[in-house]
Amino acid sequence: MSLARFTQPRVLLPVVAAATSIGLVYHYSSLSIQNDTAKTFKGGDEWIDLKLKKSWDVSSNTRHFVFELKSPEDVSGLVTASCLMTKFVTAKGNNVIRPYTPVSDVDQKGTIDFVIKKYDGGKMSTHFHGLKEGDTVSFKGPIVKWKWEPNQFQSIALIGGGTGITPLYQLLHEITKNPEDKTKVKLFYGNLTEEDILIKKELDDIAEKHKDQVSITYFVDKASANWKGETGHIDKEFLQSNLPGPSKDSKVFVCGPPGLYKALSGVKVSPTDQGEVTGVLAELGYTKENVYKF
């Protein structure tokens, strides 16, 4: 019997192993490159123009906008919780720049969604509401506010007002889409009227699907006869009865208009300085270790 029949595999096996190793290295290198290039936004100072795909009215002063990412296979590149800066140039050549938090899933491919309320005198919101399909808006980012990790806390409370719901919704959505994240969430959300409650259907759907994990309480200043939520402001008495209490196992996230910050948590000193906790939360024993202001 020829010895070649036994020696041949000893030559081939290292070759096959080497080829397999090269293939695996190439495969994972390709995935790494793909994961990097599949994000429209990668940070830095580059402004990227996105085309408006469609938009529709949510209420008399609020619209839902869907923009196309650079590629149908792209994700936005955002993480929870983060936002994008937006920019447009006025007729006088002045830059108007504002931050907006998307309401779409951070893993959504091809498009990115925003819900934007038009404010009297609001230059950017007025600009958005004047857009037509095919128009472009400049964006850059992402700007990471709070990098969420599953099960960081046993429980959290989200306190929001008006359009301040968007980062809170982003956080709520991220927690509840992950079956491994057991964080308990309470959302307290205030508005002027029932019509002003943004993304209420999406919020109610989450609360319905995650009854053992999520509770939502709505507040309105001006309630109709059929209103079933709370009337008035989010106040000390309510928070004292419903917050998880200051501890290392819980966190309170706040986002809303200046009046809400002033009354409940105190305002931020700057985008990078949370400042001290004041107002109702301070009276209840919360410090800046227990509270995050978007």
From Swiss-Prot:
Its cofactor is FAD. It is an enzyme of class 1 (oxidoreductase). InterPro entries: CBR-like, Cbr1-like_FAD-bd_dom, FAD-bd_FR_type, Flavoprot_Pyr_Nucl_cyt_Rdtase, FNR_nucleotide-bd, OxRdtase_FAD/NAD-bd, Riboflavin_synthase-like_b-brl. The chain crosses the membrane at residues 11-27. PROSITE patterns: FAD_FR. It catalyses: 2 Fe(III)-[cytochrome b5] + NADH = 2 Fe(II)-[cytochrome b5] + NAD(+) + H(+). It is found in: Mitochondrion outer membrane. Keywords: FAD, Flavoprotein, Membrane, Mitochondrion, Mitochondrion outer membrane, NAD, Oxidoreductase, Transmembrane, Transmembrane helix. One of its GO terms (biological process) is ergosterol biosynthetic process. One of its GO terms (cellular component) is mitochondrial outer membrane. It comes from the Eukaryota. It is a single-pass membrane protein. Residues 45-149 form the FAD-binding FR-type domain. Its EC number is 1.6.2.2. One of its GO terms (molecular function) is cytochrome-b5 reductase activity, acting on NAD(P)H. FAD binds at residues 152-187. May mediate the reduction of outer membrane cytochrome b5. Belongs to the flavoprotein pyridine nucleotide cytochrome reductase family. This is NADH-cytochrome b5 reductase 2. It comes from Meyerozyma guilliermondii (strain ATCC 6260 / CBS 566 / DSM 6381 / JCM 1539 / NBRC 10279 / NRRL Y-324) (Yeast).
